[in-house]
Amino acid sequence: MGFVFPVHFWGLPAIVAEFLEALTLADAGRCFVYTVATYGTSTGQAGWMARKALMDKGVAVDAGLSVRMVDTWTPLFNLTDKEKCRRREASAEKEIDAAIGRIVACRGGNTERMRIPHVIAGVYHATYGSQRQTRHFHLMADRCAGCGLCADRCPSSAIEMRDGKSVWV
């Protein structure tokens, strides 16, 4: 049983933390359980947070893995260098293949890279809630078909339809 999630502010995204908190496993059996944290600069303590949430549900994590991806936090990282992004994506594909190999072989252990000490990651992750804002986001109104699909499917209810157009809320 696997849990794959991105790292946000060196921790778990709110939607993942909420999912793990609400998770009910009547009979998880004794299957191989793994986590994969995808990250840009650091895994922070996201893997530990996921393991703790699962342990609280009585589920032991056998393997903690990580895959470095293109960092998409645009206030700090320039995504216009297409070649640099392509190289990072190619490297990520190799890391994904290695993770798949470990999972298929049921090889346990913690191979998460680029962790940050708990206290530092905790302080930074505590700012996540105040930074999760959409006020600076915009949608291309001329490209919106008004179908409402984005608003219906947004897992955070961060998009609404107003006057037949989608808007961030």
Q: Model regions: which residues?
A:
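Iron-sulfur cluster-binding cysteine motifs and their immediate structural context
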Residues: 139-140, 145-169
